[in-house]
């Protein structure tokens, strides 16, 4: 990517610049001053968050800023700069896989050792990380393995001295090469590490050995895995800054490439080790670093489990019941359907002007009219339109092709003279009837016409409404057949009583004698 005028003017200033990775789908690089990326280095909350996981989500960053009064853009820039300095470049799959491991071991700060490389210059260890086997290299990129130990002995931490950058002419031809993510090997590792440790921009890092850090600082010789994530907008720029071809170790370096030699802590020079192919990733930390003292998990990091599987809420859940009711399609009136059907009998494929005229006449929204025509054509094609067969003119094709809609122009002229349908009357209102009933409890004949106008009901409907309010009379059921049977049954009983009375009288007479 060729430097523009703004970047050239920024490079001419005394402050160091950092070219951060792309942060959007358009792969726009971010140029920022090195002071802005290091002004938050002393914030313990950010250090602890980066030690826990170097790829926090936007929700985690927002929660950090809300709790500790920080600016979100500065915090995002700080995290990008830390990953750039530490040589961290993961794909989205690697981020999710490592995030799951970190959440599982959330009582440890697994990335604490990376922070020591960020703010301090280190001397080269006695034993370098082993080379990845070829079969692992062929598999491509993979996240940092947290289970494979690596010997990191002889590590001495010293405070990093502020660096001075000398301005040299830039080789624009080298820098104008296109951005190629994950397609070339990293040809010069010392150049990459100077960029990581000192925070130089791409143009400053490519200006020669004079633009690197002071002689007392050593470059940590990593092999960086560069890959463009599919989903995460935080893409590393190391491939773009390190893609220049390195010169042979015996020839003097050019003005656009840094020196192929490394300056060690004791002042001696050493040639770089053979270049590792793309996909090589440094192994994990030593067991002593993994056995850190248990730390309390930050509160913001507890949301990592929820952020890994974002919840998806349907759009209808955010709508109120009134909004959902409005979204429902209203039923078309008989007049509207009659107009649509009469037009469909003449032309099955309406034009834009026809839709506009139908929209004015029927008062229906345009999407509903278009949907009705599509559904009606589908039903006609499958022989499910009886009213069309009954009303179709003889000689008219049953299904008209849109390419030969000759009657559309004629129908447009006819429909242009059709007046729009009158507005539908408002619905009846029975509240005046209820108020009248509550006040009088009885309907007067003089008030029938007045109530009919107020409620928009006919006089008969008003009478029926008041009749429904009147109390219903009690129902009396008379069964004549049952009564006659009961009378017939009662007659023999009366005869028996008379006979008994006569017998008693006879007995009385006998006793008297």
Swiss-Prot record:
Region of interest called Disordered, as start-end residue ranges on this chain: 200-221, 241-287, 303-328, 402-429, 480-513
Major site of localization recorded for this protein: nucleus
Residues with PTM Phosphoserine: 320
Coiled-coil regions listed in the entry: none
Stretches with biased composition (Low complexity): 248-260
Keyword Transcription: yes
Compartment list: Nucleus
GO cellular component: nucleus
Positions bearing Phosphothreonine: 418
Origin superkingdom: Eukaryota
Annotated PANTHER family: HOMEOBOX AND LEUCINE ZIPPER PROTEIN HOMEZ, ZINC-FINGERS AND HOMEOBOXES RELATED
Keywords: DNA-binding, Homeobox, Isopeptide bond, Nucleus, Phosphoprotein, Repeat, Transcription, Transcription regulation, Ubl conjugation
Protein name: Homeobox and leucine zipper protein Homez
GO molecular function annotation: DNA binding; DNA-binding transcription factor activity, RNA polymerase II-specific
Stated role: May function as a transcriptional regulator.
Subunit annotation: Homodimer or heterodimer (Potential). Interacts with HOXC8.
């Amino acid at each position: 990517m060729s430097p523009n005028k703004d970047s050239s003017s920024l490079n001419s200033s005394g402050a160091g610049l950092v070219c951060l990775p792309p942060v959007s789908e358009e792969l726009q690089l971010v140029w920022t001053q090195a002071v802005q990326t290091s002004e938050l280095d002393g914030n313990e909350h950010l250090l602890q968050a980066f030690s826990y996981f170097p790829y926090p989500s936007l929700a985690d960053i927002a929660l950090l800023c809300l709790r500790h009064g920080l600016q979100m853009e500065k915090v995002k820039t700080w995290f990008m700069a830390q990953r750039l300095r530490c040589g961290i470049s993961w794909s989205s799959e690697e981020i999710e896989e490592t995030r799951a491991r970190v959440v599982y071991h959330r009582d440890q700060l697994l990335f604490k050792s990376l922070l020591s490389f960020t703010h301090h210059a280190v001397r080269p260890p006695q034993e370098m990380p082993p080379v990845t086997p070829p079969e692992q290299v062929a598999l491509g990129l993979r996240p940092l393995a947290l289970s494979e130990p690596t010997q990191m002995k002889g590590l001495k931490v010293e405070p990093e001295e502020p660096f001075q950058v000398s301005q040299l002419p830039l080789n624009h031809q080298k820098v104008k090469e296109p951005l190629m993510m994950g397609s070339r090997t990293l040809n010069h590792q010392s150049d990459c590490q100077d960029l990581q440790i000192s925070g130089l921009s791409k143009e400053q890092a490519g200006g020669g050995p004079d633009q690197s850090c002071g002689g007392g600082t050593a470059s940590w010789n990593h092999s960086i895995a560069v890959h463009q994530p599919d989903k995460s907008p935080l893409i590393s720029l190391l491939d773009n800054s390190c893609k220049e071809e390195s010169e042979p170790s015996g020839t003097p370096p050019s003005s656009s490439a840094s020196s192929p030699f490394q300056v060690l802590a004791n002042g001696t020079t050493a040639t770089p080790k053979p270049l590792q192919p793309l996909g090589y990733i440094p192994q994990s930390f030593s067991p002593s670093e993994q056995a850190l003292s248990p730390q309390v998990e930050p509160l913001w990091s507890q949301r990592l489990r929820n952020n890994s599987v974002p919840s998806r809420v349907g759009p209808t859940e955010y709508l109120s019941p009134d909004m959902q009711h409005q979204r429902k399609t209203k039923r078309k009136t008989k007049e509207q359907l009659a107009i649509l059907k009469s037009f469909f009998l003449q032309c099955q494929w309406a034009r834009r002007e026809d839709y506009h005229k139908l929209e004015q006449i029927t008062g229906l929204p345009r999407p509903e009219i278009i949907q009705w025509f599509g559904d009606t054509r589908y039903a006609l094609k499958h022989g499910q339109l009886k009213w069309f067969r009954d009303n179709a003119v003889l000689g008219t094709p049953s299904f008209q092709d849109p390419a030969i809609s000759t009657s559309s122009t004629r129908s447009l002229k006819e429909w242009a003279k059709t007046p729009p349908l009158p507005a539908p009357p408002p619905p009846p209102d029975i509240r005046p009837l209820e108020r009248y009933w509550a006040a009088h409890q009885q309907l007067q004949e003089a008030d029938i016409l007045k109530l009919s106008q107020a409620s928009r009901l006919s006089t008969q409907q008003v009478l029926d409404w008041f009749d429904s309010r009147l109390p219903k009379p009690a129902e009396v059921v008379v069964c004549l057949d049952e009564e006659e049977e009961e009378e017939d049954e009662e007659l023999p009983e009366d005869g028996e009583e008379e006979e008994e009375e006569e017998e008693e009288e006879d007995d009385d007479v006998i006793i008297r004698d």
